[in-house]
Curated annotation (Swiss-Prot):
This is Large T antigen. ATP binds at residues 386-393. InterPro entries: DnaJ_domain, Helicase_SF3_DNA-vir, J_dom_sf, Lg_T_Ag_Polyomavir_C, P-loop_NTPase, T_Ag_DNA-bd, Znf_lg_T-Ag_D1-typ, Znf_lg_T-Ag_D1_dom_sf. A zinc finger (T-ag D1-type) spans 221-319. GO terms for biological process: DNA replication; symbiont-mediated perturbation of host cell cycle G1/S transition checkpoint; symbiont-mediated suppression of host innate immune response; symbiont-mediated suppression of host JAK-STAT cascade via inhibition of JAK1 activity; symbiont-mediated suppression of host type I interferon-mediated signaling pathway. PROSITE patterns: DNAJ_2, SF3_HELICASE_1, T_AG_OBD, ZF_LTAG_D1. Zn(2+) binds at residues 258, 261, 275, 279. Gene3D superfamilies: 3.40.1310.20, DnaJ domain, Large T antigen, SV40, domain 3, P-loop containing nucleotide triphosphate hydrolases, Zinc finger, large T-antigen D1 domain. The lineage of its organism: Viruses, Monodnaviria, Shotokuvirae, Cossaviricota, Papovaviricetes. Residues 58-78 are annotated as: Disordered. Residues 6-82 form the J domain. Residues 102-219 bind DNA.
Amino acid sequence: MASLRRLTELLCLPVTATAADIKTAYRRTALKYHPDKGGDEEKMKELNTLMEEFRETEGLRADETLEDSDPEPEESGYATFENVSVPDIDGAFFKLMKLKKCMQTYFSVNERRKQQSCPDCHLLITSITKMPQLKAHLYEHFGIKGHIVAHWTGIALLVLQLEKPTRISTVHNFCKKYCTISICSVRGIKKNCVHALIKTLLDVPGLDLEECSIDMNVVDEKQFMHAMLYDYAVQIDCTDALLLLAIYKRLAQPTDKCPECQKDKDTVKRKRSTHIDDHPRHQHNASLFLHIKDQKRLCQCAVDAVLAEKRFRSATMTRDERLKERFRTVLRNIQELLDGETEAIDDFVTAILLFNMLFPDVDVIVDILQTMVKNPPKRRYYIFKGPVNTGKTTVAAAILALCTGASLNVNGTPDRLQFELGCAIDQFMVLFEDVKGTPEPDTNLPSGFGMVNLDNLRDHLEGSVPVNLERKHQNKVSQIFPPGIITMNNYVLPHTIQARARTLVNFKHIKVYAKALRNNISVLEQRLITKPETLLAYLLIRPESEKEISADLRAEFLTVIENLKFEVDERFFQYNNRLHEGLCVHE
């Protein structure tokens, strides 16, 4: 009683103040005494202690009805009312939490923001007399799979397991219609925690279980595993959230009805070569993914996990280790290709020989790869220059696919370069594709801003100091800009850019190559010449370039390399002669 008197004194209230008045005055007085507001810290501590004791006392208060000493006559025409003392349900929850602190795992008492907004299980608390009526109304209005009714210290607890997720506010507002005087409180139970909560409730002293229609032997359905989605995105190296969403939703269908799983094993034509192995493992998790509302957000988080993995590799691995790991992945793809159909091997060998016709100087390719690995400052860019349709982009795209990196367009206005350059974050190399500038005489080429923009990116080209790169919705990253290749038609090459280039490679028209490529339409349609497997195989079959590849890597894939050389040697003379005549190799 003394603590209550002191509390009302601090709150400037009479001793007879109601619980609602005390709570309202507490919020107002707390602002007055709060240290951050210039108040008294000691009084604030005292006020919080007294208020906590008051809440505990309110939670222990029992329901009472007070009878009038001089009741009205039975037929006086006036209605009679009971003075009902309503216990503070938050206090009851506080006492319940105090008895069993581990129940905080299953639902939140004070911080409703931490609750799931649409759980499928709810905990209701009301009076024992109101419970039967309220339960009947709930069964009429909601689809209910099961329930549990328990009595504890004068109140009734109802655990509802609904057929579909329902907002906490929806259940609470429905119950309030029938609980105008009786206490009523609704709490959402976290997903897949209903059985654990019930077991915890049964251990509370003084709790009596009245009804139970929930099967306690049924194991909770497995929850969607975010980690599986993230690992899958990293596995397929997907940095497009919408593409990942579409791919993962298709894994939800049964494997026996999946068109991809029914296809013959052809890793060249199938975009996701690991689909047959991934589908059974992810099918259940993907079916749960279909019922999640924020699918795009989860896929964006998975894409962030892919970018984070790249950032980790960039920070912890040397460039030589990164390229060696990439070669290992491409060699596995070559092994699967050589184990495939003969028709696919024929096209693969044709692509290798066509690449040899387009760019026979393998030493330049080796020098480019070594420069990409060493990444020396100043002179670390290669310029591919030549007329239109001479194979500049084909060779550059093959190198980019083998090393991995980003293709950048710098022909726009300078204000558009900021986020374009941000695509180079954590990349191994970059390709400045089809850079425009001032046309050379008699070329009839359009002019552009590309050369001017590159000239203004001297720190990026030199790689001597870190530069700030930025992606949308991400913080700036300071890093050494990656090395790369510049492709251009016959534009005037500024001296300042040429001074920062390692080599200028000139391309010319090769009529026989163009004719052979047109006649071998299957190679053209599958874009096999720009595939990383084609370029690496080209390096492996040339003796002068094979020795530049790591010896331990060649020893690890010795059988694959020998099989590759056998397939090429078996077809070389026939295919090479027909290609140099501009004919299709299959005729």
